[in-house]
């Protein structure tokens, strides 16, 4: 909304800078009002479209988090850099439905992927016999969403997590 107001002020400033100091018939002002109303409608439509997609994605996955792959296969450090550049995060499912949404991506691609498990995690989905520090200091999820210890040098499917917080 602020962007719309700033755009209107910019249009007015351009008009005044071009030497049009007067607007006796109110044509310029009316034009600015029309433009502002049009921009407000565009903003409302964009917001509605975004929220519709957000609700659909959340409904379909049961999660307010979106797990996306670029289909690359990389080690943990490369994954960290890729997710950071995309302004996302390494997956860190905090709830069962989030883990299921993450596992759906892995199952669809038939690949395993890294995830991060916090020290104070309320939800975990370790496979039997895990965690096993001898296998490595990283954690990967299999195509069923079960978690396993892994080497951080393993090349796994790149999956980043994005939050929908409104």
From Swiss-Prot:
SUPFAM superfamilies membership: C-type lectin-like
Tissue specificity field: Expressed by the liver.
Keyword NAD included in the entry's annotation: no
Keyword flag Transferase: no
Superkingdom as given in the UniProt entry: Eukaryota
Function noted in UniProt: This phospholipase A2 inhibitor binds directly phospholipase A2 in the presence or absence of calcium.
Protein name (Swiss-Prot/TrEMBL): Phospholipase A2 inhibitor clone 10
Organism this protein belongs to: Bothrops moojeni
Source lineage: Eukaryota, Metazoa, Chordata, Craniata, Vertebrata
């Amino acid at each position: 909304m602020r962007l719309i107001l700033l755009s209107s002020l910019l249009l007015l400033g351009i008009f005044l800078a071009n030497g049009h100091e007067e607007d006796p018939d109110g044509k310029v002002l009316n034009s600015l009002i029309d433009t502002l109303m049009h921009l407000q409608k565009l903003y409302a439509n964009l917001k509605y479209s975004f929220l519709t997609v957000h609700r659909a994605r959340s409904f379909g996955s049961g999660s307010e988090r979106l797990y996306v792959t670029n289909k690359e296969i990389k080690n943990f450090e490369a994954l960290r850099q890729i997710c950071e550049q995309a302004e996302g995060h390494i997956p860190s499912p905090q709830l069962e439905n989030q883990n299921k949404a993450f596992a759906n991506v892995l199952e669809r691609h038939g690949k395993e992927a890294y995830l991060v498990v916090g020290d104070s995690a309320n939800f975990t989905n370790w496979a039997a016999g895990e965690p096993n520090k001898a296998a490595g200091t990283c954690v990967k999820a299999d195509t069923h969403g079960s978690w396993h210890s892994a080497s951080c040098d393993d090349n796994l499917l790149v999956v980043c997590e994005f939050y929908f917080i409104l």
